[in-house]
Amino acid sequence: MLTVMGLVLLGLSELSFGAYASLALLNHPNIASTALRRLLGGAFALLLATTLVALSLPAWRWGAQAAFLVAALLFLVAWARVEPSDDREWMSDVARTARATITETTITFHNVRNFDYHSPTEFDEAWDERTYRLDRLAGVDLFSSHWMGPAVAHVFVSFDFGVDGRIAISVEVRRERGETFSWLRGLFRHFELAFVVADERDVVRLRTNHRKRQPEQVYRYRLTGTPEMARHFLLAYARRINAAVERPEFYNTLTTNCTNTVWELAEMNPGRVPFSWKLMISGYAAEYLYDQGRLDSSVPFAELTRLGHVNARAQAADRAPDFSERVRAPE
């Protein structure tokens, strides 16, 4: 016989699962009919409410629990059939999937995006292949691009190979043609995950020079650590990129996004940092790394952020071949 505490815990677990299942059915990516999605989501929500009420009614309790269990199992079976795919009609900027070839001394990235943008939606497409010597990896930069105040940002990294140049890696939503992003639908398997490997003139300049409707403010921070730590981080990224080629993944607004994917990869590094709520709110990721001693601590964070603001320098550099050097030029 369940105690009062046991009933409370059972009710909370059912509430959590039932709320997710109801919302998932309301936003089911494989059910085109809005009316059917509403019917299924509403029915599950009604069953959840009935089950929770029945917890206080001994005569109805276990019958309601059995019905809820059957519905939950049916939902899980149906939800497991929603699988990510590499075979869709993708937007041009995520049409190709990056992959990496690793040897003892080099790393080669295939399908490196190097678009020349005229506007956010107009560009000359170019996809490259780039090879770098691992012994020339000098460090890693973190870019944080803000467009809705301090809390909301897109975070990506760039690996510095010195005279060989730099390569940026950005974890993004792989949108289909005509598809728009929604943070709510991003919780329910609507979008695949994309690892965009790109030239900085592509991924930085797009945000600083062309996105004007919601202007983005882009900041660059140099991560502390040894070249060996940077190499661990790079190789972890490369393995994850290759794994996504073999087995596509879903993007998730909370669990598999630009910020916590970077943290997961960094956790493989001997110099990893502990998880924090600030990594869930992407705009505070850089500040958290500063607090953990992973950014230059010789100046206050506000000053480091001011010095790292790259918009004006990126706009001045524009298409220049030395774009990356110019966005890093001291004031």
How would you label these PLM feature ranges?
Residues 47-85:
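Transmembrane alpha-helices and immediately adjacent membrane-cytoplasm interface residues
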Residues 100, 112-120, 268-273:
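Short amphipathic alpha-helical segments with coiled-coil-like heptad repeat character
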Residues 2-50, 238-331:
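Activation targets extended, charge/polar-rich intrinsically disordered C-terminal tails
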Residues 107, 112, 118-215:
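Glycine-rich catalytic cores of cysteine/serine-nucleophile enzymes that process amide/ester linkages
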Residues 102-106, 160-164, 225-230:
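A short, structured loop/turn motif at beta-sheet edges
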Residues 92, 149-151, 262:
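Short, glycine/acidic-rich beta->alpha junctions
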Residues 188-268, 274:
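Soluble catalytic domains of enzymes that build or remodel membrane lipids, polysaccharides, and related
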Residues 83-103:
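Alpha-helical transmembrane signal-anchor/signal-peptide segments
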